[in-house]
Structures are given as C-alpha cells and as structure tokens.
Design a protein with these regions (language model features):
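N-terminal subdomain of nucleotide-sugar transferases
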Residues: 1-46, 225, 368
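An aromatic- and histidine-rich active-site surface loop
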Residues: 14-17, 70-75, 80, 87-119
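Membrane-proximal helix-turn-helix segments that form the acceptor-binding/catalytic region
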Residues: 80-83, 98-99, 103, 116, ...
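Carbohydrate-associated surface elements
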Residues: 155, 172-175
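Conserved donor-binding/catalytic core segment of Leloir-type glycosyltransferases
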Residues: 196-213, 219-222, 234, 354
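A short, well-ordered alpha-helix in the C-terminal region of glycosyltransferases
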Residues: 200, 335-338, 342, 349-363
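Nucleotide-sugar-dependent
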Residues: 213, 262-271, 278-299, 304-317
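Nucleotide-activated donor-binding/catalytic signature segment of Leloir-type glycosyltransferases, i.e.
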Residues: 236-237, 243-269
C-alpha cells in the first residue's frame, strides 16, 4: 500500500523544505500546501507536489488574521477533495490549521512552532476568555490523538505538557540554513579586507534591529571600552531601532561602531566569520520559546557567543551545555565589557570557545529533519 503525506505550512522556509524532503525519502507521494516558499540553498525534491494557498500577510494584525482564516478554509477544502488518502502533517501556521483534524479523520502529526492559545495573551486574550478556554480543550483532545507532537525546544515542550503527556512530545532543535558556513581566517576573508577590519577585534551583531531586540545595550558596553580603539562593534541589519541606536552612538561620540545594511547571502559566510565575538539578544517574552535561527549559523563559523538573555532561557541552556560563550542579563553591561576585554586579552580562551561552537554545530545540521518522519 502506498504511503502518502501532505504537509501544511503557510510560510515555508529552509527548515520546512528540509523536513518535506525527509518525508519524500520515505513516502511514495508527498504534497506541500503553502502560501509562500522562500528560496533555500537546498531545493524541494522533484517528487514533491506544491499546492498553493493565500500568502501570509504580516503587514497588519487584521491582514494576519484574515490570511490565516482564508488560508485555513483553503486547506480544509484541499484536504477534503484532493488529499483523502493522505496522512497530514500540520504546522502551526496558520495557527488554527491543526484544528481541522476535528473534521478530517485521518492520521496526523502537529509541528508546534508557536503555542496557541498561549500566544493570544499578547493581544489581551487571557485564560478567562471563552476562546482561550475552548482552545485549551481542543488542544488536549487533538494533541492526545496525534501520531506526533513536535516542537523546537525543551522550554516549549514544558509548556505543551499542559495539553499532552510528555511522552508524546518530541523536541527537535533547528539547524543552519547553509552547508557553506565554516570558519574563515581574517587574513583570507574578503569581507574583512573590504571594510579594512584586519586589525580590529570585532563584536558582531547580525540580524533584525527591531523593538524586541536589545541591541542598544551595545552602546553602553562600548562606553566602558571607548579607550580601546582596536575594539569594533559591527552591526549588520535593519529595523525600527537602527536609527535610534545610530543617534545614541553619535551623541556618545563613539567611533567604535560600523553600521551596514543587509548583506547579500553570498557574503554571509564571510561576514559571520569576521566575528571575534558574536552577539545574540533575546527578550524576556521569547526567551523560553526557542533558540534564534541565527545561532546555528554562528555555531557553524565557530563564533564565540555573547548572549543577552535571561539565564533560564533556551539559549542560555545551549551555551551552558556546549561551553561556547556566556549569557548575561540586559543590565549587566559592565560584565559584558569585562567579558569582551577578557577574550581579547586571552586568545587561547577565545580559541577554546570557538572550537566548542564548531563542536556544537555538529548537533544542528539538516540531518535533524529526518527525526520528523
């Protein structure tokens, strides 16, 4: 008997592509229902049938909800009329997609990237709201019947225990987007040469500079280190807070910052490898959820990490496990400055942290996708 599976994810990126490809190895017919598919270094297998739905629109809260709802209705009709003989793998985008399992009676698994109804608290829907209470009941019923409930971190797994027995929860960590990432010495790094950074000790932040990213504390750290002209804070990316941080740097008369916009993906191996220390930030609201995807790219280039996150975060657990950096609370700016100075003064310590990052990277490769099947 043929094994058929349809996977559902409104916004598909490299992680989902790798997961779908893992299913394609073991299943006869594989379909992907998606609104958008972001280009990845690894392409979808030729045997995968792509079935398009409405693209997820992040531009406003109303558009998010409308595209979620419309996408869910499209998924329902496709499952009823096109995929009657298919096992189903739901991803929580749209968040309500797996609720269709109430009406679509066939084997299913659920991949939990965002936990609902818990995420509804961000818009004021709390445990006392009827929608919240009803969703809790749905979760307990549907999770119990699922073949697999898969999530991204131990912290998220702990939250899911409110809805399903821990034995049914499988934690699978994410992985790097690229196979091309590896350490590149500064002397052989064209990105370093282009920006004349050969003699700099580089503190790198690469990523979004939004309201939830505590990048501005790097300005306070730089104040402590202003007397060392060899230390450079390299900020790569864009976001709502970038201009504010540039203003802070200007007002403090700091010359130790270089701001660059997003770099071409071909530059990524070189820009990440430029880091003597790589910075990752998490706010309190997201600390328990998962490890930022950029972490795995930084591990692959052997970057020592300086994490600005709560000590009970998933990121802190990773760093403590692999001993490849240190985590600090956001107000520990002086301690972070001391940490940077220590790594600059003791290259042997930085070298050990770098080796530990490379060792950790071996646990976070796209082969992890095989665990989903």
């Amino acid at each position: 008997m043929k094994k058929n599976v349809v996977l559902i994810n409104q916004s598909t990126g490299y992680l989902m592509i790798d997961i779908v490809n893992a299913y394609a190895v073991q299943y006869d017919q594989v379909a992907l229902i998606a609104g958008s598919i972001k280009d990845s270094e690894r392409s979808l297998a030729d045997k995968v049938h792509i079935d398009k739905i409405v693209v997820y629109d992040r531009s406003s809260a109303i558009r998010r909800i409308l595209t979620w709802l419309f996408g869910t209705m499209q998924i329902l009709f496709k499952l009823i009329f096109k995929y009657r003989q298919y096992e189903v793998v739901y991803v929580t985008n749209p968040p309500m997609s797996y609720l269709l399992a109430y009406f679509i009676h066939r084997p299913y698994s659920i991949i939990v990237y965002d936990i609902y109804p818990d995420a509804l608290k961000n818009i004021g829907i709390t445990e006392h709201h009827p929608i919240y209470r009803l969703w809790v009941k749905w979760n307990k019923s549907l999770f119990a019947k699922a073949k697999k409930v898969i999530t991204l971190s131990e912290g998220m797994g702990k939250v899911l225990e409110l809805y399903v027995n821990r034995s049914q929860i499988k934690v699978i960590y994410n992985w790097s987007a690229s196979d091309k990432l590896h350490p590149i010495e500064k002397t052989a790094n064209p990105f370093v040469k282009q920006h004349e950074l050969e003699d700099k000790f580089i503190i790198l932040y690469s990523g979004n500079i939004g309201y939830t990213h505590n990048v501005e504390c790097l300005v306070d750290i730089a104040e402590y280190l202003r007397n060392d002209p060899s230390i450079l804070f390299l900020i790569i990316g864009e976001g709502k807070k970038k201009e504010m941080i540039q203003d802070m740097v200007s007002k403090a008369q700091l010359t130790s910052f270089l701001f660059l916009t997003w770099q071409n993906k071909d530059v990524l191996p070189y820009s990440l490898s430029a880091a003597d220390v790589a910075v990752i930030t998490l706010n309190d609201d997201t600390a328990q959820a998962s490890v930022p995807s950029k972490t795995y790219n930084l591990l692959a280039v052997g970057a020592p990490l300086m994490c600005i996150s709560p000590q009970n975060s998933e990121l802190a657990r990773l760093v403590n496990k692999f001993q490849n950096g240190s985590c600090f609370e956001k107000d520990e700016t002086e301690n972070m400055a001391v940490y940077i100075s220590k790594l600059k003064a003791h290259p042997e310590i930085r070298k050990e942290l770098s080796a530990n990052s490379l060792l950790a990277a071996k646990s976070f490769t796209y082969q992890n996708a095989e665990e989903y099947v």
